[in-house]
């Protein structure tokens, strides 16, 4: 792979996908050492981060988001979604509920294969309040279909917990984690606090 490649994610079909600048690098299936130049895909805007879900990869950029789909690296297709909802934090990208959730300037967005891009926080929090949490600082995790966003707005650190169940809501916690790991086998979220 190129020396500058970062953000490696793995699709369900064994294709590794990384990026550098505005170039996407797919690998040969199950060969994460082989990234032929002929598979490269370019985006209009610089890539912020990636998120894999099913046979798809979410591409968060500084402009429009994209979705890459396909079963073979030679026939991957990339779709530019029409909404200008930039990804403001690569650490906000979380796979959950059959898609990818990420922080945009306007709120949390979800990308799924069936519904495309939709806002999860419209009606829950207005843009000014959202911006007061500095979404570009988010370090986020999922547990039991809840989205945990640890934030630092320069004066306050904390955690926003979004529950997108039957009655969507969110609340704040007075804890701040610098890192975390979702241990699926134990159904637990381990956090580095302090």
Roles of regions detected by a PLM:
Residues 14-33, 69-70:
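Blade/loop signatures of beta-propeller domains
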Residues 1-13:
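Disordered, low-complexity "stalk" and linker segments at domain junctions of extracellular
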Residues 10, 17, 41-43:
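A structural/positional concept
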Residues 1-2, 31-42:
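A short helix->beta-strand "capping" segment at the edge of beta-propeller domains
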């Amino acid at each position: 792979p190129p020396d500058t490649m970062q953000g490696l994610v793995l699709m369900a079909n064994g294709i590794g996908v990384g990026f550098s600048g505005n170039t996407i690098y797919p690998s040969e299936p199950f060969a994460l050492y082989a990234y032929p130049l002929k598979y490269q895909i370019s985006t209009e805007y610089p890539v912020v981060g990636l998120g894999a879900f099913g046979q798809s990869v979410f591409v968060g950029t500084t402009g429009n988001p994209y979705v890459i789909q396909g079963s073979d690296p030679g026939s991957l297709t990339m779709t530019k979604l029409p909404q200008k909802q930039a990804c403001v934090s690569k650490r906000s990208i979380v796979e959950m509920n059959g898609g990818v959730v990420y922080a945009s300037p306007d709120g949390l967005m979800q990308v799924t294969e069936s519904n495309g891009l939709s806002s999860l926080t419209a009606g829950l929090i207005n843009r000014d309040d959202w911006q007061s949490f500095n979404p570009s600082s988010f370090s986020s995790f999922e547990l039991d279909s809840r989205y945990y966003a640890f934030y630092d707005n320069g004066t306050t650190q904390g955690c926003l917990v979004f529950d997108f169940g039957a009655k969507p809501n969110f609340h704040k916690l007075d804890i701040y984690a610098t890192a975390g790991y979702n241990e699926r086998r134990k159904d637990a979220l381990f956090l580095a606090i302090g």
